[in-house]
Curated annotation (Swiss-Prot):
<keyword id="KW-0804">Transcription</keyword>
<dbReference type="GO" id="GO:0009432">
    <property type="term" value="P:SOS response"/>
</dbReference>
<feature type="active site" description="For autocatalytic cleavage activity">
    <location>
        <position position="153"/>
    </location>
</feature>
<comment type="function">
    <text>Represses a number of genes involved in the response to DNA damage (SOS response), including recA and lexA. In the presence of single-stranded DNA, RecA interacts with LexA causing an autocatalytic cleavage which disrupts the DNA-binding part of LexA, leading to derepression of the SOS regulon and eventually DNA repair.</text>
</comment>
<keyword id="KW-0805">Transcription regulation</keyword>
<dbReference type="InterPro" id="IPR006199">
    <property type="entry name" value="LexA_DNA-bd_dom"/>
</dbReference>
<feature type="active site" description="For autocatalytic cleavage activity">
    <location>
        <position position="191"/>
    </location>
</feature>
<dbReference type="InterPro" id="IPR006200">
    <property type="entry name" value="LexA"/>
</dbReference>
<keyword id="KW-0742">SOS response</keyword>
<dbReference type="GO" id="GO:0045892">
    <property type="term" value="P:negative regulation of DNA-templated transcription"/>
</dbReference>
<comment type="similarity">
    <text>Belongs to the peptidase S24 family.</text>
</comment>
<protein>
    <recommendedName>
        <fullName>LexA repressor</fullName>
        <ecNumber>3.4.21.88</ecNumber>
    </recommendedName>
</protein>
<dbReference type="GO" id="GO:0006508">
    <property type="term" value="P:proteolysis"/>
</dbReference>
<dbReference type="InterPro" id="IPR036286">
    <property type="entry name" value="LexA/Signal_pep-like_sf"/>
</dbReference>
<keyword id="KW-0235">DNA replication</keyword>
<feature type="site" description="Cleavage; by autolysis">
    <location>
        <begin position="118"/>
        <end position="119"/>
    </location>
</feature>
<comment type="subunit">
    <text>Homodimer.</text>
</comment>
Length: 232
């Protein structure tokens, strides 16, 4: 599934290709998505390419080919506004309540365990305060919990201050996953996980913040992001 920003960029590129026969420039993409820097566009394009939605053609400037578009159900949901919303795994599909619910859409109570920093790491609160209800098929298998996002270091990934991050408990992660990382058993942060040689990189999605490079013995994975819960 695509994040909202990824979907908006894919739609913008596809519409420009249909209208003009050439893809938009990075500056045009940045302005269309209201991003502050072109580095955010680079990350979005890389994510779209990794997911098989676009292909960058070698040795040609501004050469981007749209290979496929999201399913109609996701495209329609990304265009609607509502309260509250749930954004599915990797922040793609948005669902609203419907008159008839099948088993996968029936709400599941997810405990809210505290706050998580999307910025400078803060202490992760581990006391269950309340629950939020999300459709069962948004979570998948495993044990899940929610953390309230504080900070703006992941805005280019579509994660905003005040969002509820839906987390699947997990002690391992693949490169590129957005994870809850516990640093030195004291501070927790929400960042993109990558391996760099023998080290671990915790990457923000905001150029105002720096990548943190840490040895593995200082980082514990507490879970992987599978979705967002947002009220408008």
């Amino acid at each position: 599934m695509l994040t909202r920003k990824q979907y908006e960029l894919l739609r913008f590129i596809n519409e420009r290709l249909k209208e003009a026969g050439v893809p938009p420039s990075f500056d045009e993409m940045k302005d269309a998505l209201d991003l502050r820097s072109k580095s955010g566009i680079h990350r979005l394009i890389t994510a779209l390419e990794e997911r098989g939605f676009i292909r960058r053609l070698p040795n040609r400037a501004r050469a981007i080919e749209v290979i496929k578009l999201p399913e109609l159900s996701q495209a329609a949901s990304n265009r609607r506004g509502f309260t509250p919303s749930v954004i599915e795994g990797n922040l793609g599909k948005v669902r609203t309540s419907t008159p008839a619910l099948d088993d996968g859409e029936r709400p599941v109570a997810v405990p809210v365990m505290g706050r998580i920093a999307a910025g400078t790491p803060i202490e992760a609160l581990q006391t269950r305060s309340h629950t939020i209800s999300v459709p069962a098929d948004m979570l998948g298998n495993g044990d899940h919990y929610a953390l309230e996002v504080r900070g703006d270091s992941m805005v280019d990934a579509g994660i905003l201050d005040g969002d509820m991050a839906l987390i699947q408990r997990n002690e391992t992660a693949d490169t590129g996953d957005i994870v809850v990382a516990l640093i030195d058993d004291e501070e927790a942060t929400l960042k993109r996980f990558r391996r760099r040689g023998a080290s671990i990189a915790l990457e923000p999605a905001n150029t105002a913040y720096e990548v943190r490079i840490l040895p593995p013995n200082r980082v514990k994975i507490q879970g992987k992001l599978v979705g967002l819960y947002r009220k408008y």
